[in-house]
Amino acid sequence: QTRKIILRKRYWLYYALTFIAGARRQIFIVFAGFLMVEKFGYSVTQITALFLLNAAFNIWFAPIVGKLITRVGERAALVFEYLGLIGVFVSYAVVESGMIAAGLYVLDHMFFAFAIAIKTYLQKIGDPADMASTASVAFTINHIAAVFVPVLFGGLWLISSSAVFFAGAAM
């Protein structure tokens, strides 16, 4: 394992997918939660119930996704994830029902299980000596998204909550 931080051109797609995953996580954690509370008046108890439902459901769902990724490959799994997220984000932008929004929230969280495909993609394309340093770079890229997306999209939220989700779908 290389102990130096190395940014390699051949891993550009992995880095891009990592940034998108970090941005998407922030949209889910911050702005989907805002939507549930601000637009639909969800209480702390209701949001907590959704968190618990998501956690319980993913205990069952994540192993299925892992087997699916093994069967169809990372590319197909990630295409499915991102197409699904486009649908979820566009739906967040236009939803008028709190119950449908809650369903979208659970569906949105289900797609987190597909994030493992990004890691297995790196394992397939990466040099074993680069794994630690590439993971360090990816961790940093993910955190860059975690810092900038809430700030930028928070400003956008002040203009239009729907615009946040349309921008997330475009990303």
Language-model regions, residue ranges each:
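Helix-to-loop junctions at the C-terminal end of transmembrane segments
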Residues: 61-74, 157-158
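Short amphipathic helix-loop junctions that connect adjacent transmembrane helices
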Residues: 30-47
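Structural signature of the two symmetry-related core transmembrane helices
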Residues: 76-91, 169-170
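Hydrophobic core of transmembrane alpha-helices in multi-pass small-molecule transporters
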Residues: 99-113
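Juxtamembrane intracellular "pre-TM" segments in multi-pass secondary transporters
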Residues: 1-23
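Loop-to-transmembrane helix entry/capping segments in MFS-fold secondary transporters
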Residues: 44-45, 128-138
